[in-house]
Amino acid sequence: MSDLAYKRTNVYEKADESTMKAIFDYAEGYRKFIDGAKTEREACAFVEKAAKKQGYKPFAFGKKLKPGDKVYYNNRGKNIYLIRVGSGNIGEEGIRIVAAHIDSPRVDLKQVPLYESDGVALAKTHYYGGIRKCQWAAIRLALQGAVVR
């Protein structure tokens, strides 16, 4: 019966040196991404730059694509699509879609946010994603984003 029991293992105790190096190298790449992509627009720019390094070209509507083509489409700097054209028969083999969602926690101010209450200046915010207002008192904030006129 002990063979079926769940045993906790720690990767730091079990992994060899090359595996640990691969783990930390991957984590360092992720750290660079989250450091350089704090908003959706920054994430799109980051991904576009990385895609260009991998040989992706801008997508052009009406241009015929051929197997092996790698193109990207940046939709107004808010989302990006990467496309690698395969060589198989779509009707028989189908297509593979890999999707990722950019979710940037933030305080999103309304168009005219400032108001005063009880002698204190406050800001009206949009509420997305379930972030509690009390969480923001515990972390450093940066002012980033786009100004809308």
Residue ranges with predicted function:
Residues 1-149:
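N-terminal hydrophobic/helix-forming segments and targeting peptides
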